Curated annotation (Swiss-Prot):
Site (May play an important role for the adaptation of the alcohol substrate into the binding site): 176
SUPFAM superfamilies named in the record: Glyceraldehyde-3-phosphate dehydrogenase-like, C-terminal domain (SSF55347), NAD(P)-binding Rossmann-fold domains (SSF51735)
UniProt KW keywords: NADP, Oxidoreductase
GO terms (BP aspect): D-xylose catabolic process
Name of the molecule in the record: Trans-1,2-dihydrobenzene-1,2-diol dehydrogenase
Tissue expression from the record: Kidney.
Keyword Oxidoreductase: yes
Residue(s) at site: May play an important role in catalytic activity: 180
Catalytic activity from the UniProt record: (1R,2R)-1,2-dihydrobenzene-1,2-diol + NADP(+) = catechol + NADPH + H(+); D-xylose + NADP(+) = D-xylono-1,5-lactone + NADPH + H(+)
Highest taxon listed in the record's lineage: Eukaryota
UniProt subunit comment: Homodimer.
Site (May play an important role in coenzyme binding): 71, 79, 97
C-alpha cells in the first residue's frame, strides 16, 4: 500500500524531496498534497510536481484525512510549529534537520509525538546512504579494532545565501552544517552522551556562528572532533580510527557515495537523479523516504537508525556549543 505524503512548505529542499518521491514506485509512495503559507505558491508547486491538492495554510494540510505522513521542509525556526500542528492532527512526521533551533524545541516535539503515539523522525538523510550503512557494518564487525577517535569537517562559503547568515532565522554553521558532523561522531560512538565538550569559534558579523571547532570527550577515553564553517572551504570528509585501521567517508561526507576502509576504496552509486535537483546527491533522499515507509508499515513510532533520544542529544550538544561561543537566537529561552 502506498504511503501518502503531504509536503509542508515549498522551498528548495521540499522540491527535491518531492521530486525524489516521484521517482519511487507509485505503489509505495504518493504525494497527495502540498501546503504553503501562500496559496499561489502552493498551486505553482503542485502544478510543477503534479500534486492533486494545494493548500494555502499548513493547518489545511494537517487536517486532510488523505495525508498519512507530513514532510516538514520549512526553515529551522518554523519546524516546531509545523511539526506540532501535524502531530495534533494525528499525522506521522518526517522533519528536516535540525529538528529544532534548540533542545527545548526538540523535547517539546518528542514529548508530543510520544504522548500521541505518533511516528516522528529527524531527516538526517546521511545515515541512510549505502556508504553510511556500510560504515556501520564495518564498525559492528570490529574491523577497525578498538576505536580511538572520530573526525569530521564540513565547511563552504555560504555568505551569499541570505538564510545562512540570518540571525533571526537561526543561521550559522552549527545548525546547517555542524549537525552533519555531530551526527557522524554520535553514530560512530553509538549515541553516547559526551562527558566533556570543548569549543573554539568565531562569530560572523551578523551574530551567527561563523567557524567552529569542537572536541567531544566520550566514555572510555575516546574522542571526536569536528570543524564547521560558513566562510571557509573545508575537506568535507569524515573519518573514524581504531587500533587496526581507519575508515573514511569522502567528500561530500553529508551525502556520501565513497567509503575507504583500511585503504580499500568502495563506491556506492546513487539512484537516477530527478531533473533539476537543487542539492548535491539529492537522489539520496530516497533512502530516508523508504526507511520512513518501512517504519510506518511495521508500526514503529520512531526510527531505530536515528531514534528520538539521539535527536535530543544532538540538539543538546549543538546548543551547548553555541552557548560556549556566545551565540543565542531569538528562539532560545533565557
Amino acid at each position: 500500500m502506498a504511503l501518502r505524503w503531504g509536503i509542508v512548505s515549498v522551498g528548495l529542499i521540499s522540491s527535491d524531496f518531492t521530486a525524489v518521491l516521484q521517482t519511487l514506485p507509485r505503489s509505495e509512495h504518493q504525494v497527495v498534497a502540498v501546503a504553503a503559507r501562500d496559496l499561489s505558491r502552493a498551486k505553482e508547486f503542485a502544478q510543477k510536481h503534479d500534486i492533486p491538492k494545494a493548500y494555502g495554510s499548513y493547518e489545511e494540510l494537517a487536517k486532510d484525512p488523505n495525508v498519512e505522513v507530513a514532510y516538514v521542509g520549512t526553515q529551522h525556526p518554523q519546524h516546531k510549529a509545523a511539526v506540532m500542528l501535524c502531530l495534533a492532527a494525528g499525522k506521522a512526521v518526517l522533519c528536516e534537520k535540525p529538528m529544532g533551533v534548540n533542545a527545548a524545541e526538540v523535547r517539546e516535539m518528542v514529548t508530543e509525538a510520544r504522548s500521541r503515539g505518533l511516528f516522528l523522525m529527524e531527516a538526517i538523510w546521511t545515515r541512510f546512504f549505502p556508504a553510511s550503512e556500510a560504515l556501520r557494518s564495518v564498525l559492528a564487525q570490529g574491523t577497525l579494532g578498538d576505536l580511538r577517535v572520530a573526525r569530521a569537517e564540513f565547511g563552504k562559503n555560504l555568505t551569499h545565501v541570505p538564510r545562512a547568515v540570518d540571525w533571526a532565522q537561526a543561521g550559522g554553521a552549527l545548525l546547517d552544517l555542524g549537525i552533519y558532523c555531530v551526527q557522524f561522531i554520535s553514530m560512530v560512538f553509538g549515541g553516547q552522551k559526551p562527558e566533556k565538550i570543548s569549543v573554539m569559534g568565531r562569530r560572523h558579523e551578523t551574530g551567527v556562528d561563523d567557524t567552529v571547532t569542537v572536541l567531544l570527550q566520550y566514555p572510555g577515553e575516546v574522542h571526536g572532533s569536528f570543524t564547521c564553517s560558513i566562510t571557509a572551504q573545508l575537506s568535507n570528509t569524515a573519518s573514524v580510527s581504531g587500533t587496526k585501521g581507519m575508515a573514511q567517508l569522502l567528500n561530500p561526507c553529508w551525502c556520501p557515495t565513497e567509503l575507504v576502509v583500511k585503504g580499500e576504496h568502495k563506491e556506492f552509486l546513487l539512484p537516477p537523479v530527478p531533473k533539476n535537483c537543487n542539492f548535491d546527491n539529492g537522489a539520496g533522499m530516497s533512502y530516508e523516504a523508504k526507511h520512513v515507509r518501512e517504519c510506518l508499515r511495521k508500526g514503529l513510532k520512531e526510527s531505530p537508525v536515528i531514534p528520538l533520544v539521539e535527536s535530543e542529544l544532538l540538539a543538546d550538544i549543538l546548543e551547548e556549543v553555541r552557548r560556549a561561543i556566545g551565540v543565542t537566537f531569538p528562539q532560545d529561552k533565557h
